[in-house]
Amino acid sequence: METDNSIESQIAAVLSDIHQKGYSSVQPFIIGKVEQRMLLFAQANAVTLASDELYMSAKQFQHCMRASKNAKGLVVADIDLICFPQNRFQMDLYYDGECFIYTDGLSKFIIHPNYKMKVNREEVKLVNFITATRRTDKKEFNGKRYIKIQ
């Protein structure tokens, strides 16, 4: 297993590539194990987790940094993306019927439990970070759509 600094460095390198070149060719990488809250909720609620590890990918970083989000002020700061693997354990965790959502009150990080993607030309299913965005509605998670996971 990689150290947290190595994971943070890997995320920083991908973000740097995207800022400089508009893309990164880094393959999807593991940022750690699926945490206990998510695992127990999935087991109790028949949610399929494709793996016991959580992945991030350059493609998804590009998605959360796209120009349309930037124009609306919804892009999450690089430092928040870099620190997400460590900080997620202190964040609130929700489930919306399809994805898991981590939030720190200011931003939200969306995790798909069974995401299909190509890795080394082979289609696989992973528990994958799919996007992050700044929160604009502070009451967003108060509705019935979201289940808070303890």
Question: What residue spans do the PLM features occupy?
Answer:
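Ribonuclease/tRNase effector modules and their secretory precursors
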Residues: M1-Q150
